[in-house]
Regions:
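Anionic-ligand-binding alpha/beta catalytic cores of soluble enzymes and soluble regulatory domains
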Residues: 1-44, 48-54
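Short small/polar-residue motifs
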Residues: 26-30, 79-84, 112
């Protein structure tokens, strides 16, 4: 057996480690309203996002073009011009651009798709 074939065999065995494959989950919705401050209000209710991890493995895609990482509360402490997803209280998920208008800066309107992946 050549050296390359032996190496390829090791790679193959490593890829069959039980539990190595991770199942991706997602929630799909859309922007239903733009607030007076430019936040993008979605139709994704707290019952849908309640069990979503609040870590960097969670990604939110808006209008198939803009992405942010993680879910935050209203007390987020993120720097200016950071796009964040706020999942807090009884309100639906909203996308917020710190100290600016997400709708204007991203060019997103009601009807745009929103997807949470983790």
């Amino acid at each position: 057996m050549s050296r390359n074939n032996a190496y390829a065999g090791r790679i193959r065995r490593k890829s069959h480690i039980p539990g190595a494959a991770q199942v991706s989950r997602r929630i799909q919705g859309k922007v239903v309203e733009v607030s007076s401050t430019g936040d993008l209000i979605t139709d994704i209710a707290p019952t849908a996002w309640n069990d979503v991890p609040r870590s960097t493995e969670t990604r939110i895609l808006v209008d198939q073009e803009h992405e942010t990482v993680g879910l935050f509360g209203d007390d987020h402490q993120q720097p200016a011009m950071t796009l964040i997803a706020i999942a807090d209280g009884d309100a639906p998920l909203k996308l917020h651009l710190v100290e600016d208008s997400a709708a204007i800066m991203l060019g997103v309107r009601a009807g745009a798709s929103v997807e949470i992946r983790w």
